[in-house]
Amino acid sequence: MQGRRVLWVASLLSLGQTAGAASIDCSRCDEWNRDQAPFQIYGNTYYVGTRGLSSVLITTAGGHVLIDGALPQSAPLIAQHVEQLGFKMTDVKVILNSHVHYDHAGGIAELQKLSGAKVIASDKAANALRTGKLDPSDPQAEIEMRYPGASNVEPLESRPSIEVGGLRLSVIHTPGHTPGGTSWRWQSCEAGRCLNMVYGDSLTAVSDDSFKFSGDPRYPTAKADLLASMDAIAATPCDIMIGAHPERTNLWTIFDAQGKGDRNRLIDPSTCKRQAADARKYFDKRLEQERNPPKKSS
């Protein structure tokens, strides 16, 4: 069985390196897509992403959950990491997403094909995941990069949580960076000690050159949404936080490229509050720049 799994992973990597494989070319893509050995975060929660883009596997006896798919060219690496940990891609039943930009959603369609999982997303994110195209209201719509669309995308609608194999993941709506941004909270346990795990969406006020967070008709509630999202994350019970970009929660100050490190150092109930506070400082600077844009040299 193990031999067959190794062959399956090898074929995945070969597929990902063929000329026809989906891929996006951007200034940071190679850096983001550097390989990173998978590792256990805590209990049934594992890091299976690349060095620059997070993807998290949460396992249960009744099927697994995968959060985020990174770039299109990241999908073979993520699938390889799942198998390296001793799990099967075909046991992934649900794929979730933080937000629909190409560096977090680009690999979801391929991961769905490899697993047969359904994709569940916020109502405002579902269509972008189906089409691989951002809604015009997205602050980065003018600099978007298209990616393969997924099938069987199920909107969250009004559900406050989803359940897979006895695991409950609470929905934390965190719009602002995108209109449909979503963070997720669940519990993982080790030796009877259960911790609140949070996969945090981006809270940064990043956009194309024309968008204004202080007020823009394409997304008039962007400022209010982002501020409310910061408050929501700050108020979330949070023992371990994994950011959609791993360096945002200092993951690589703890783990090396081989996935070795002191997992206990990840446990920090102040992380969510600190992330929200840092995002607010960045947002205040962004709003100041919009009020007083730098003068263009003649």
Predicted regions and their residues:
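Bacterial N-terminal signal peptides that target proteins for export
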Residues: 1-8
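Bacterial N-terminal signal peptides
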Residues: 8-17
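Metallo-beta-lactamase
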Residues: 22-26, 34-36, 40-42, 91, ...
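Accessory terminal helices/loops
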Residues: 22-31, 191-193, 205-298
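Conserved beta-strand hairpin/beta-sheet module of binuclear metal-dependent hydrolase folds
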Residues: 31-85, 89, 183-205
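Active-site environment of divalent metal-dependent phosphoester hydrolases
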Residues: 36, 74, 100-106, 126-129, ...
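Divalent metal-coordination and catalytic microenvironments
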Residues: 44, 58, 68, 99, ...
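Active-site HxH/HxHxD metal-binding segment of metal-dependent hydrolases
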Residues: 73-76, 83-161, 260-261, 265-268, ...
